[in-house]
């Protein structure tokens, strides 16, 4: 989204948006700063920003909330709303990225609700290419995403319902 202000100057490979609510008297900024410091020391993060006010907090959330619209404008080859057990989210991403890395020129957009294991894992044409060039591979792409999700004990269906009944039958023995 061209008019959307990004929180980081240099765009990182991954963003994690954390919104906390704490008991009265506790300082959320201090809690997040402690979290960032520990994560940085452990090599888990390279940068972090704590919202300084509600306007900045809303600005951070706007980046996340505009992702579906940005995806729609670009035009995905194949979009997925899947779930995997929370502890296996990194494994799903590793396996799926490795699988689709063999396909050549594609872009992947993965975002979701990491607190509950729901992911939107979307495949897009490479920059400057048309999604029509990939239409013959759409079923193969969908099958791979669903297979990886199910292999990890997840589902082809997350927050937006059960999806197509045929998939429910295929993976649940309908």
Where are these regions (language model features)?
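Noncatalytic alpha-helical scaffold of FAD-dependent oxidoreductases
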Residues: 1-174
């Amino acid at each position: 989204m061209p008019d959307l202000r990004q929180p980081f100057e240099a765009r990182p490979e991954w963003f994690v948006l954390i919104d906390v609510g704490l008991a009265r008297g506790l300082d959320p900024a201090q809690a997040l700063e402690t979290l960032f410091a520990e994560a940085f020391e452990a090599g888990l993060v390279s940068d972090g920003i704590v919202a300084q006010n509600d306007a900045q907090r809303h600005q951070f959330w706007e980046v996340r909330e505009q992702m579906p619209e940005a995806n729609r404008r670009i035009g995905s080859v194949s979009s997925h709303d899947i779930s995997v057990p929370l502890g296996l989210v990194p494994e799903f991403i590793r396996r799926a990225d490795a699988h689709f890395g063999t396909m050549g020129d594609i872009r992947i957009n993965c975002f979701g609700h990491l607190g509950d294991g729901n992911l939107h894992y979307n495949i897009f044409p490479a920059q400057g290419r048309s999604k029509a060039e990939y239409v013959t591979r759409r079923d193969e792409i969908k099958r791979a995403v669903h297979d990886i999700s199910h292999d990890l004990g997840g589902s082809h269906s997350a927050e937006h319902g059960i999806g197509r009944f045929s998939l429910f039958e295929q993976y649940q023995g309908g």
